[in-house]
């Protein structure tokens, strides 16, 4: 995790890397994604947002507690719990999902697709509404999530979108 002042945004930003998550009601949260997925949760009543960044759905190996955030099977429940521990109300949670790029779409293993489908299915299981998804493109992206508006800015190599 890296905290810095982003001169373009004129804001304090916390950058998370694979396996990390962060919850805030003040700081913008950012990460860079390819086939990994970031789940961004919001409780608008408390201006609270949280973001995780997971690499794979699961692992067949034994995983140390420090590595669990790298796998969606742990990362999504951990993010939900972190939101609740920081004052969110589960019935107010909403989600936006990003990443899931399939750089090698012709290969038999489509990590991005598996990651994105897992996020959708898991949030449906928790009955958390998904307000936006940005998957299925063959390009990387950098995302910025804002706590006061739940706006997420996505920067691609060739442009920007707002979700």
Swiss-Prot record:
Protein name, as recorded: Probable chemoreceptor glutamine deamidase CheD
Domain of life: Bacteria
Keyword Hydrolase: yes
A molecular function (GO) term: protein-glutamine glutaminase activity
EC number of this enzyme: 3.5.1.44
GO BP terms: chemotaxis
Class of the enzyme per the UniProt entry, highest EC level: hydrolase
CDD domains associated with the record: CheD
PANTHER family reported in the protein's UniProt record: CHEMORECEPTOR GLUTAMINE DEAMIDASE CHED-RELATED (PTHR35147:SF2)
Keyword Glycoprotein: no
Function as written in the Swiss-Prot or TrEMBL entry: Probably deamidates glutamine residues to glutamate on methyl-accepting chemotaxis receptors (MCPs), playing an important role in chemotaxis.
Similarity field: Belongs to the CheD family.
Keywords, in A-Z order: Chemotaxis, Hydrolase
Reaction catalyzed: L-glutaminyl-[protein] + H2O = L-glutamyl-[protein] + NH4(+)
Organism: Borreliella afzelii (strain PKo) (Borrelia afzelii)
């Amino acid at each position: 995790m890296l905290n810095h002042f982003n001169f373009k945004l004129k804001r304090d930003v916390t950058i998370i890397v694979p396996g990390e998550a962060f919850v805030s009601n003040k700081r913008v949260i950012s990460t860079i994604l390819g086939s990994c997925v970031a789940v961004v949760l919001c409780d608008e009543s408390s201006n609270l947002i949280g973001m995780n960044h997971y690499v794979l759905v699961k692992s067949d190996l034994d995983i140390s507690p420090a590595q669990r955030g790298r796998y969606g099977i742990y990362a999504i429940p951990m993010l939900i719990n972190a939101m609740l521990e920081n004052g969110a109300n589960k019935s107010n949670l909403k989600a936006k999902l990003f990443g899931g790029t399939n750089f090698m779409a012709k290969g038999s293993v489509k990590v991005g697709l598996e990651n994105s489908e897992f996020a959708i299915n898991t949030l449906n299981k928790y009955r958390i509404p998904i307000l936006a998804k940005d998957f299925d493109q063959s390009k990387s992206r950098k995302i910025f999530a804002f706590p006061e508006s739940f706006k997420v800015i996505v920067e691609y190599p060739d442009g920007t979108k707002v979700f």
